A protein has these predicted regions:
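Short, charged/polar N-terminal "headpieces" of proteins
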Residues: 1-28
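Short, surface-exposed, low-complexity cationic segments
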Residues: 22-50
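Short, intrinsically disordered/low-complexity patches at protein termini
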Residues: 38-39, 44-46, 54, 63, ...
């Protein structure tokens, strides 16, 4: 069964190691066969992989596009271990990602890592907000005069 992919004008898609860019109008592609496929919006470049979760995503992306889990296995394991040390509460998400990798479904692991990125942003935002709170526990607002 063919995979149907609709592309917006000028949208890019990676099929295997080839980048395909659409022209000026919408297009529908039917792709048959086994190839790694990622839309432009699902790709994180090396320069964008600045957070631990995004680095995990980037390594999974390399595994998927290169079709070579072994070449990137050590980097993946090291990144996962470091993330778990820093945020043990992420275990349910990490577990799902690693289960997909173990079963060979790297595409689903990539999709599950989007949840990890969202979680990382949530806890980072919470920590930054917490750091800005006054040490006395107040919310920083002065009481209004009656």
């Amino acid at each position: 069964m063919a995979l149907k992919v609709e592309l917006k004008p000028h949208e890019k898609i990676v099929v295997g190691s080839v980048i395909i860019q659409n022209g000026d109008t919408r297009a529908r592609l039917l792709i048959e066969g086994e190839a790694a496929i990622l839309r432009e919006r699902d790709i994180i470049g090396a320069s964008e992989a600045k957070s631990p979760a995004k680095r995990i995503y980037f390594v999974l992306q390399l595994m998927y596009l290169d079709q070579d889990v072994i070449a990137h296995k050590n980097a993946f394991i090291n990144l996962i271990d470091a993330f778990m040390q820093a945020a043990p509460s992420a275990w349910p998400i990490i577990s799902k990602i690693t289960d997909h990798v173990i079963s060979g479904d790297i595409y689903r692991a990539i999709k599950a890592t989007r949840t990890l990125i969202d979680y990382e942003e949530e806890i980072t935002h919470h920590e930054l907000r917490h750091e800005r709170l006054p040490k006395d526990g107040s919310d920083g607002n002065k009481p209004k005069a009656a």
